[in-house]
Amino acid sequence: MSVLLIALFSLILLLALLGAAGVFTWGERRLLGFLQERLGPNRVGPFGFLQWVADTLKLLTKEDAPPAGADLAAYRLAPALAAFPMLAGFGVVAFAPRLVISDLDVGVLFVMGMLALTVWALVLGAWGSRNRYAMLGGLRAAAQMLAYESFLGLSLMGCVLLAGSFRMGDIVAAQEGGLWFILLQPLGAALFFLAGLAAAHRLPFDLQESEQDLVAGFMTEYSGMSFALFFLGEYLAILLVAALFTTLFLGGWAGPILPGPIWFGLKVAAISVVFVWLRAALPRPRYDQLISFAWKVALPLALLNLLVTAWIAVGRAA
């Protein structure tokens, strides 16, 4: 694509992502209401659809006052660091064969790097707030990301071995006309999904902002637009993890009859619904259970899956 087309597509994608994150907040609340046998938002607009617009306007008009003694540089930087890397991660996501801003040779690694940056936002926000609850949340976030990032990378390496490339388009092309990698890599898909929940800080892996014991965790001292940026980063992270899962395991844009971008969007929406369903269905484990599961169960399984996949790939090549 020319520079002008790339700029135009980037602007359209930015607006679409911001709108999708807002609509997702409404959809999550409606779905949680249905799963918990209550109404959910139903006052602002038809079926409460404009509730996310009202919430956005409310947060834009609220005062954003840092606490006394806060490290202002870290306090202000953290919300931006939570949201902007997620937007950058979508720059390498291939929505169709030629519908991508930059199809990097290391696209998968780039997205993983952007997801890993979220922990810096959480730690900076906790440190800058000078609040005990926030610091506990930041420490939990750092330990959790260290544990789950380890097998997040290993779980997707099976797809990279089968496709022979880190490029998003090549991974989707390897699944076209054949089996999706979720059928060839069921264990890898399950482990990647669990690690994705942790990377997006979603229940049951949201112990860094556990309301029962940490008030709001690293976000305790935030309000107004800074608070909104943290939430925007969280919902964009869900969409980014869902987009990466779709690319790696669900054939990306591949599908019959409908155009590729529509298939891609439907698959991402389905994965996002599963995220919400798990939030309604699962309890929150103890912190030590969560970390023990990552190091003692998930990491060995990810290594085993990688070894078996490598053996199969070498056998094919031979």
From Swiss-Prot:
The keyword Transmembrane helix applies. It is found in: Cell inner membrane. It catalyses: a quinone + NADH + 5 H(+)(in) = a quinol + NAD(+) + 4 H(+)(out). Keywords: Cell inner membrane, Cell membrane, Membrane, NAD, Quinone, Translocase, Transmembrane, Transmembrane helix, Ubiquinone. It is a multi-pass membrane protein. GO terms for biological process: aerobic respiration. One of its GO terms (molecular function) is oxidoreductase activity, acting on NAD(P)H, quinone or similar compound as acceptor. The chain crosses the membrane at residues 4-24, 77-97, 106-126, 146-166, 179-199, 214-234, 238-258, 262-282, 293-313. It is an enzyme of class 7 (translocase). InterPro entries: NADH_UbQ_OxRdtase_su1/FPO. Its EC number is 7.1.1.-. One of its GO terms (cellular component) is plasma membrane. NDH-1 is composed of 14 different subunits. Subunits NuoA, H, J, K, L, M, N constitute the membrane sector of the complex. Belongs to the complex I subunit 1 family. NDH-1 shuttles electrons from NADH, via FMN and iron-sulfur (Fe-S) centers, to quinones in the respiratory chain. The immediate electron acceptor for the enzyme in this species is believed to be ubiquinone. Couples the redox reaction to proton translocation (for every two electrons transferred, four hydrogen ions are translocated across the cytoplasmic membrane), and thus conserves the redox energy in a proton gradient. This subunit may bind ubiquinone. This is NADH-quinone oxidoreductase subunit H 2. It comes from Cereibacter sphaeroides (strain ATCC 17023 / DSM 158 / JCM 6121 / CCUG 31486 / LMG 2827 / NBRC 12203 / NCIMB 8253 / ATH 2.4.1.).
